[in-house]
Amino acid sequence: MLFSTVLSHRTLYILTCPNTLIHSYTHPHIHAYLAFTGFLTQLHHLEISCLLLLFFSLSSLLKLMADPDCIFRNGYVDYYNYSFNYATSLSRIYNSHDSFYYPHQTTNPNINENPNLTSPDSPPLREALPLLSLSPIHKHQEPTANHHEYYFMETTETSSNSNFLDQCQDSYRHDVTVDLHLGLPNLGDGGSSSSDVVLDSTDHQEGHHDHHQDQGLEVTMASDHDDEHGGLQRGNHLHHFWIPTPSQILMGPTQFSCPLCFKTFNRYNNMQMHMWGHGSQYRKGPESLRGTQPTAMLKLPCYCCAPGCKNNIDHPRARPLKDFRTLQTHYKRKHGVRPFACRRCGKAFAVKGDWRTHEKNCGKLWYCSCGSDFKHKRSLKDHVKAFGNGHVPCCGIDHEEEEAASDVEQQE
């Protein structure tokens, strides 16, 4: 009480008097107060800040030890309420003592002169702790969404890769379709079921040597339960067949090339015999005739590609031909150009052998003992065989002429 009274009456005098007047004043409370304020002024501002920060840190730690759940009660840390704003505290201290005398300074130290202590720091943003949050449902749902998002992205990426692989496979199948024309041709609305197929592994290995020669060939397979195609109904197993194009039929499916001089041959054996002329080293090993592999494609049954032909696969009673060579002869005779003409009667032929046989026998008549005449020897023989006794060939048909019978008559 006495201290406050003396301070209230003597404040202005004490603040303005010199040191000699202050020291000459002998009141014990005034001396104690002045000693405390002198001690504070002698301390550095940073030391005071450290002491105050340590004090309030200890107080916060004690409060945390008393109630450890207070920090995470709301899912976040309240930095603003539990932090010590030492700048505000220092400003209050200096503002309350700004009228005291400082022996080491000529001006009153104002807190505003320090740029670091001009204004209190803004409170930090409130953010949830990811590991100590008390809302596990929300935190559990978010990874689930991310999981679904990742699964969707992975599914999309997998689908895009699968689409890419499908496109690669489709392009590969397209190439194979262009080269080999896999699958049955379109049978229309009335067509029966069929399945696409490739050659067996054995046939594929046998024809691997002729891979380049067999490009562009069409390989198909149909089931034998096809009632509309009578030639296919031979059991419950599947048969391979081949539908060559007209260019393949006319020019041949194989062109074997010599690796040394690049001369081409229609037959593999002819090419091997040609290579013997290049040296004796080609008579042994894989280059010799011992290792010749037959062309598997040439042994397959073939359908004619000409529309309307009875050997066409679209024909209701279609039958495949024996092999490719038979198909070549059939196509030339029935659907090909006929460049050979008889010099006697002018009849045209597509096969050279048929033309030579016809020209040799052109204009001749074949007679029977009964008086019947025939243009073809085959017809006379059929006549004699049919009527038997009393019917014999006349004009002395020799064996050489019998062997030179026309192949056309045999096919017809």
Curated annotation (Swiss-Prot):
Subcellular localization, as worded in the UniProt entry: Nucleus
Classification via SUPFAM superfamilies: beta-beta-alpha zinc fingers
One cellular component (GO) term of this entry: nucleus
Region Disordered, residue ranges: 187-214
Compositionally biased spans, kind Basic and acidic residues: 201-214
GO molecular function: DNA-binding transcription factor activity; zinc ion binding
Any one GO biological process: primary root development
Zinc finger extent (C2H2-type): 256-278, 303-335, 340-362, 366-391
Top-level lineage group: Eukaryota
Keyword Ion transport listed: no
Keywords, alphabetical: Metal-binding, Nucleus, Repeat, Transcription, Transcription regulation, Zinc, Zinc-finger
Motif Nuclear localization signal: chain residues: 332-335, 375-378
The keyword Transcription appears for this protein: yes
Main location per the UniProt record: nucleus
InterPro entries listed in its UniProt record: C2CH-3rd_BIRD-IDD, WIP1/2/3/4/5/6, Znf_C2H2_sf, Znf_C2H2_type
Family affiliation: Belongs to the WIP C2H2-type zinc-finger protein family.
Protein task: Probable transcriptional regulator.
Name by which UniProt lists this protein: Zinc finger protein WIP4
Taxonomic source organism: Arabidopsis thaliana (Mouse-ear cress)
Gene: WIP4
